[in-house]
Amino acid sequence: MPEPIEPRIERFSTRRTGRCAVRGPEDMAAVQELWIVLHGYGQLASRFVGGFGAIDDGSRLIVAPEALSRFYDARTPLASHIAAEVGASWMTREDRADEIEDQAHWLAQVLETYRARVAGDVPLTVLGFSQGAAAASRWVARGGVAPAHLICWGASLAPELDLGAGAPLAATRCTVVVGERDVFVSAAQIAVERARLDAARFTHAFEHFAGGHRLDDATLARVAGVARVVGGAPATPAFP
C-alpha cells in the first residue's frame, strides 16, 4: 500500500464576533479605573464578572472579554448536549502560536474600545484568573498595553515570558494571588514560582487567602486598594 499523504495545512484570517460582560457605572465620566478581567478555563464572561461585586463601587469599569473558543462541558453526555453547560477557553496546544496571536488582537481591540469610552486616561488593571492569568501575562508581555497593575489569580505568569529588566513586564506592578486550599496550585509549585521570579529580579508580590480556586471578596478588595468590601466587611488582611 502506498504511504498516506499528509495534507497541507493552510491558514488565513477570518472575522469573529467576540463579546464582553461589563459591570460598573453607565456614566463614563464617573469611571476612575478601568479593569480588564480574563476568566478561567471553562468559564463564561457573564458568570465570571459576577465575582467582582466587592470592588464595584461606582468608580471602576470592569470589563470581562470572553475567550473566542467555546465548548460543551465534556462531563455531559453527548446525547444531552442541548442542556449542557458551555464554557470558553483562551487556547489549547493545537495551533498554539496562532491562538495566542488571535487572543492578543482580540484583547487589544477590547482595550481600545473601552479606552475610547472612558473620559480621560484612567489607570488600567489587568486581572487573569487561572488559564486567564497566562493569557493576561502574555498580552502584557507583548507590549502595547501598559497596565498600572497586573494580577495573576489562581495561577502565575506564563512560563516562557521574558522577565528581564528591559522587558515590558518589568515595568508593570504584578501581584500573584493563590488560595491556600487551591487544588490546582501546590505549595511546591508556589515555591518554584517564587524562586523563578526572584531569580529574574522581577518585582512582584504574593497574596494568600484561606480558600480554594476562586475569587475572594476581601482579598480582591485589598489587592484593588479598596478599604471596604462593597456591601460588606472591611478588607482585612488575609494570611501572610
Where in this protein do the model-derived segments appear?
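C-terminal catalytic histidine-bearing segment of alpha/beta-hydrolase fold enzymes
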Residues: 188-240
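Flexible "cap/lid" loop of the alpha/beta hydrolase fold
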Residues: 75-81, 155-174
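Catalytic nucleophile serine of serine hydrolases
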Residues: 40, 130, 154
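Serine-hydrolase catalytic machinery in alpha/beta-hydrolase-like enzymes
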Residues: 10-122
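Gly/Ala-rich beta-loop-alpha elbow adjacent to hydrolase catalytic centers
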Residues: 127-132, 136
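Short beta-strand/loop motif that positions the catalytic acidic residue
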Residues: 175-178, 182
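Hydrolases whose catalytic domains are alpha/beta-hydrolase-1, hotdog thioesterase
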Residues: 135-139, 161
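A conserved short beta-strand
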Residues: 145-158
